[in-house]
Amino acid sequence: MYEEIRMKFTDIFIRRPVLAVSISLLMIILGLQAISKLAVREYPKMTTTVITVSTAYPGADANLIQAFVTSKLEESIAQADNIDYMSSTSAPSSSTITIKMKLNTDPAGALADVLAKVNAVKSALPNGIEDPSVSSSSGGSGIMYISFRSKKLDSSQVTDYINRVVKPQFFTIEGVAEVQVFGAAEYALRIWLDPQKMAAQNLSVPTVMSALSANNVQTAAGNDNGYYVSYRNKVETTTKSVEQLSNLIISSNGDDLVRLRDIATVELNKENDNSRATANGAESVVLAINPTSTANPLTVAEKIRPLYESIKTQLPDSMESDILYDRTIAINSSIHEVIKTIGEATLIVLVVILMFIGSFRAILIPILAIPISLIGVLMLLQSFNFSINLMTLLALILAIGLVVDDAIVVLENIDRHIKAGETPFRAAIIGTREIAVPVISMTIALIAVYSPMALMGGITGTLFKEFALTLAGAVFISGVVALTLSPMMSSKLLKSNAKPTWMEERVEHTLGKVNRVYEYMLDLVMLNRKSMLAFAVVIFSTLPFLFNSLSSELTPNEDKGAFIAIGNAPSSVNVDYIQNAMQPYMKNVMETPEVSFGMSIAGAPTSNSSLNIITLKDWKERSRKQSAIMNEINEKAKSIPEVSVSAFNIPEIDTGEQGPPVSIVLKTAQDYKSLANTAEKFLSAMKASGKFIYTNLDLTYDTAQMTISVDKEKAGTYGITMQQISNTLGSFLSGATVTRVDVDGRAYKVISQVKRDDRLSPESFQNYYLTASNGQSVPLSSVISMKLETQPTSLPRFSQLNSAEISAVPMPGISSGDAIAWLQQQATDNLPQGYTFDFKSEARQLVQEGNALAVTFALAVIIIFLVLAIQFESIRDPMVIMISVPLAVSGALVSLNILSFFSIAGTTLNIYSQVGLITLVGLITKHGILMCEVAKEEQLNHGKTRIEAITHAAKVRLRPILMTTAAMVAGLIPLLYATGAGAVSRFSIGIVIVAGLSIGTIFTLFVLPVVYSYVATEHKPLPVFDENKTTH
């Protein structure tokens, strides 16, 4: 009775065609309304938050900064929640602490938490520091780099225009977190003190500084309230111009006045000269626009472009501007390519189905499942607050081949009954009843496979949650269509006793031949079952080798139309050196025919390095891939001895990390000298390994430092205090901000310093004077002694331990996974006692993800096994079905290994290829379900043995298995020939599924029947239950 009711469920839709059509139309309508409401992104929303705490302490050395500023802040900040890691750099005059938050941490809450921790220790920080600046960003590279240059205006004037006119406009765009200015030469009122003239006037530094501060103050004078009129008071107590500041009286003795111009030169000039930028060889000022942690780069860039065009029209006649790099160009190109692939895959699937069916009328039945499923799933994306992104679009490509499977199986079964003499209506009723359970089982099995991906954490989980649920949603809808619309259409469109067309005859003839060949070969296999079983065992035994022989990486290297190059020079050099050293490199870059723009920023990200972004021409305008261009440029870079430089790919997934793809951090509580020696040995081993084309260590003792010792006894006899010495040296050398002035409505720093000629070498100290307690000038050199030492440029820390970071770019042919594995082994075997190691950049993400996908794969296998066990009420039958999984996986791995041998990009174990392997689990088990379900029914209803049942089932289900496999494989063919942005990732997942499904299907058709004959449950016909019979 239960069986009859269950099977009659599908009859409703055959008998009520309007109901079947209405259900499908409803899904299409809901899907169409969702299209305009879904956001378009590169990847699913992934919040990466990096908080930076910057503190300036002008004139202080790195050790002082670390002891009194960095360490105090670190201790407090470490108590904040959701920190992934914290690193810091203590450099002369500045402390920078970088806090990388865990993925998808609320950026506003994280910023507030860190800010509270900073404020808690501000009172414990030294006097003389500037207030710590706390900022939050996504941490990745800017989404857009824009250059500004002029043949008439100098860099200070260009920078001033950008700060006053351009930057404020970009900040009006929602989603812009930061606008960095590189090559900037910001204006400041520079006071170039003359130590000898000050000594001649008996003026001490405190006297000069006090006069400057006391005579430039902002006054809030309130209002005058009369009986009827109120007046606002404005008191001009600030300096408004260079002339006013120059005429400032520093001291007076009757008519003898000493003005600032008598002891110093005052001018409006550059605040500092820490970075230089060039664009295509021309000196420029470059803006980098960084989005907020939660912003959609595509939306932000879309708003920037019209604003930028408006800004260009406002530029002075002598100023020019270009967009040097736009990250969203590659994103939009990749999305466009994927959408195009969806169209191509649909056409190919249509042709393949036609080749198997041969009837234009019949082909409508499975083909309609494609638009209904693809459009219908959009309503699910909307309900889950998902977006249209590369992952959901990739899921739709895979779905094209999947969603027709169920409809094909239903169509084929109904068509078989029509050819057996049934009317289309009866064939639809009988055929759908027979196939309903396998269809539901296959749908549940596929959904079960993807569910573990939706439960994963980390980057992989964030990326593939939407992928998995999109694919599962499309499969669910296709199952609904297969059991509602497809049977109804079959009853209306298919004809009994109709004369076959020429194409139908050819198709039938060809498939008949295939069927007969398969039957013959299967019979041979079943006669030699032990040989086939041995073959299967051999295949299974090769799986560990096939896995281990593949390289691993987080994501394959893509041709993104742009790449980064980092140049490093010795720590002791200045910005002039690095700029000149990089000129030959950039000349080689610009002479490369595929290069469109070349940007070089000397002095970034550190004072002795250069950040370079090279933009290539459109993919259609060049024949060479990005990797080939980078390799050529890297080879030419080896001939430049002054600087170590290497190009590397922009990270495919923006995880808030910057720099080369591999960075290992050595940590210890020991002193920096010991750490530097250990790091140098580790670096030497890396260079000797031949696995890295570029390496750079951030802790080297090669920077000259003058250690000044004060004779406190002698200074005391003169009445000279340590505070006086500190203030004098600070005002002469550090370039500290004394006060600020208002010029044309904009605040500028007032910076005191001696001229460059008076600070070229330690000998300059002989011209510095202090004021003794009796008012006489005393040479500074008389109370100090100096010793030249070598020190690091900066003192880095990681997780509150002294650290040394080695950044590296693996050699071509060496994956980041292989490089990391070598580094882990090297560090484990060779680091001394008291040392540990960690990773940064892309390497950190790869290590953190670890075996997450392997666990997901195992979980998918377990879940689908349990689902099948429930369906078959057996443990052994699911084991037989699952035997096809290692067969398919071996096919995929063999293909990856062969292609990897020929250095084909994307043939590594990465998140895309591993997701392809997980997808294979669901696809290949469908074959086993189809065969085992028929075999089970044959045993229950016809009393056949296991061998007879599975042989019959394999022959009956050959055609739908071949059709569904061909449809799936054909739908993925465009991925194998993908070009342009994102092509390698699409190829990676495509080749795994195509190779695995094709080879796995061939193996399954022969191995599964053999295994079934040995392992499967013997299904006995159930006894008829008589409710009137009494048992004792």
Curated annotation (Swiss-Prot):
It is a multi-pass membrane protein. It is found in: Cell inner membrane. It comes from the Bacteria. Keywords: Cell inner membrane, Cell membrane, Membrane, Transmembrane, Transmembrane helix, Transport. Residues 37-337, 384-389, 458-470, 549-852, 899-910, 980-992 are periplasmic. Disulfide bonds: none annotated. Its main location: membrane. The chain crosses the membrane at residues 18-36, 338-357, 364-383, 390-411, 439-457, 471-493, 530-548, 853-872, 879-898, 911-932, 961-979, 993-1015. It holds the Pfam family ACR_tran. Residues 1-17, 358-363, 412-438, 494-529, 873-878, 933-960, 1016-1032 are cytoplasmic. InterPro entries: AcrB_DN_DC_subdom, Acrflvin-R. GO terms for cellular component: plasma membrane. One of its GO terms (molecular function) is xenobiotic transmembrane transporter activity. Could be a drug efflux pump. PANTHER family: BLR2861 PROTEIN (PTHR32063:SF28), PTHR32063. Belongs to the resistance-nodulation-cell division (RND) (TC 2.A.6) family. This is Uncharacterized transporter HI_0895.
